[in-house]
Amino acid sequence: MLPADVPLCHLGPSVLLLLQLLLPSASAFFPNIWSLLAAPGSITHQDLTEEAALNVTLHLFLEQPPPGRPPLRLEDFLGRTLLADDLFAAYFGPGSPSRRFRAALGEVSRANAAQDFLPTSKNDPDLHFDAERLGQGRTRLVEALRETVAAAKALDYTLARQRLGAALHALQDFYSHSNWVELGRQQPHPHLLWPRQELRSLAQAGDPTCSDCEELSCPGNLLGFTLLTSGYFGTRPSKPPGKCSHGGHFDQSSSQPPRGGINKDSTSPGFSPHHMLHLQAAKLALLASIQAFNLLQSRLGDRGFSRLLDITPASSLSFVLDTTGSMGEEINAAKIQARHIVEQRRGTPMEPTQYVLVPFHDPGFGPVFTTSDPDSFWQQLNEMHALGGGDEPEMCLSALELALLHTPPLSDIFVFTDASPKDAFLTNRVESLTQERRCRVTFLVTEDPSRAQGRARREVLSPLRFEPYEAVALASGGEVIFTEDQYIQDVAAIVGDSIADLVTLPLEPRVVVAERPLVFRVDGLLQKVTVRIHGEVSSFWIRNPAGVSQGQEEGEGPLGHTHRFGRFWMVRVNDPPQSGTWEIQVTAKGTPRVRVQAQTSLDFLFHFGIPMEDGPHPGLYPLTQPVAGLQTQLLVEVTGLGSRGGPGGPLPHFSHVVLRGVPQGAELGQVPLEPRGPPERGLLAASLPPTLLSTSGPFSLELVGQDGVGRGLHRAAPQPCAVVPVLLELSGPRGFLAPGTTAPLSLRIASFSGPQDLHLRTSAKPSFALTSNLSRVHLEQNEAAWGRLWLEVPDTAASDSVVMVTVTAKNGEASTMPPTHAFLRLLVQAPAPQDQLPAPAYSTDPVLNTSRPAFHFFTSVTQGGAGGGLVGNPWWTTFGVMLLLLGLGPW
């Protein structure tokens, strides 16, 4: 093992090469990059988290050469910005989408930043290594890492990423909030991840640690000692005499003697009295974050770790199947498509990462079957057959809700049924859940809603009985396709198409209007364009920018190949499609559906944020949907910017976003997109107009810009958004749920737009007993209320099972505002015995080393004190602190 005080210049050439990647040049410890208007040039928690993840991903790619492709070389990444798009293109092949990986990193980064914003965490000193609570902070850090591993092993990667974000926040805060850097330490603390190793040389309650400093910058306010300390923040707990403050604009304790502080969160003296040590603290926090990632990798294995960060271009395959007696053809169609996907993609980068199967059959639904093994999935699906019965309606939305709970974000879910939903009361909740999970739902319905024939019915059914499916499909960015039994196998072929990374091209107008063509735009970064039309169509034609047309005749045409399956038409446009404006003219009875999709690596992720100024640090608190009355930012992350007109050509860019009403498509406004950080990161922000934030209806986002050679680009968000009337925050207990216990939950509800009379409903899935002390609440503008919930976990609750708690806030019956939902995922785990750790390999005596090793900062476009040598074993592995660096030695 490598002693902790070995100078980095002695680590060898391969390690020094890696360090060029590790160290950003100038640009935690503000929460996210959106904080940097307050302190330009600072390194944030988001920077540290993403840089660490990219480095570990590169390490994983270097260790495992891609099948059928040349191995990656570390030298090819030196002196360049380390970007997810470049890593995926080098490993999986040009154009391989990194969208899911970047979305997973976004989940971790937002959970990290949320520690500074959530009411239950922002002022807890144990979660930030504040107030000299170093032992307690280490305990909470290790707990969060344990919870990350447990959630990942239970296949709940969303919860695992949330706990990982919390763990990384605490780990990174240690180097900014303590005096580890001031003690001259050049490497991460050797004991933070070792719960059985004592933290030595800690300042005690009676030890004075700081002198008074009346300036913003306080380089010499630490007293001359070799004890480890950290600053006090705010008033809880109160700062004892002689102790250091955190310091900065937001810290009330810094005005009490001794004034000043020691935090290194930013480059600004107004926020960070030890701003001059910001880069040194960031370097150690980055190395420690890499160490934590590697330790998780050793515990989860390469496959489990890859799932944790979604290091794959592939999506998941999720089926919700009606198994009533009339569904034989549909079940066979699902089997055929699943078998085709399994056989075609096995062993390739596009092999689905997870398979989810949920059956339903009145009066029941489930259980859910989840696996990453294609053979197990196929066996389970192959054993599924149509059962007796056949009454309409069925428990479809309950089964879909269960699938959403277990399907990874950014996935497609396919529902096969010939019945309307019996549980239509779940429609709003399922709509919100699809948007929270960013999952697209496609319903394949083998029943014409206008016919009265088909399966047995208990009553005369309304022609509007399928409207809940339409609502869920619209909210999720999916669609409802009506077909007949004889065509279901052909129509189901869209399953194989849809699990590729597709974008839906915006149409103008959004719906078919008589005698008016639909217009869509094709750019040079699109391929495999597909036009789907379904309805009572009598004729249609498609025209390309050159004026070449093709009608509805089946077979090969001048623009592509046309297939017809009853009332469903599909045109596969020849590659490469001509760039420019295309038109579609449809003549039909009723309102036909038209959908245009294409494959591309250039896409975008987005979320919303509100400026926070009352927490420990400035930043943007992330939201799934904007909240009425709150100044809201749209935050965009463009993926696939490696796509350009030619090698070395200029990057594509987006200049503004168009906001449109849903479903008609009327323009609600345009707002400019402002870049944040280097252009190659693809980070953009826009302020939503106040007029939009008073709109109760859904709206869509369309990004507009140019490719690298000046041609137009249009990308639409896959799902519509909506302004919600109130802010709901739901938080759970520390750790996991244990069978046979009652878990307390906290609820905060706030209004920023005016008086609200709200009815609150709570539910848990599975159906655990859930009680609340808040069922109705009246709020005035800028008023909030707190509530408590108690979740009873039965003795029979299965370990490693996921519980989803939902709180719904709905205005009075006369209100047209949609309800607001908050979702909380919790994991049930039986208490485990304490980990038995081997004895230290050698002495744990502190080794003081205040001399600085001969380390040189390398230019990259990316971004001796307490304790002693590298000793002992962490609770999950035997690797050492410099694991990643040691692992590169043989290279």
From Swiss-Prot:
Subcellular location: Secreted
Gene from which this protein is expressed: VWA7
Chain segments carrying region Disordered: 238-273
Secreted is among the record's keywords: yes
Protein name (Swiss-Prot/TrEMBL): von Willebrand factor A domain-containing protein 7
Keyword field: Glycoprotein, Secreted, Signal
Signal sequence coordinates: 1-28
Organism: Bos taurus (Bovine)
InterPro entries, alphabetized: GBD_Hemicentin/VWA7 (IPR056475), HMCN1-like_VWA (IPR056861), VWA7 (IPR052577), VWA7_N (IPR056862), vWFA_dom_sf (IPR036465)
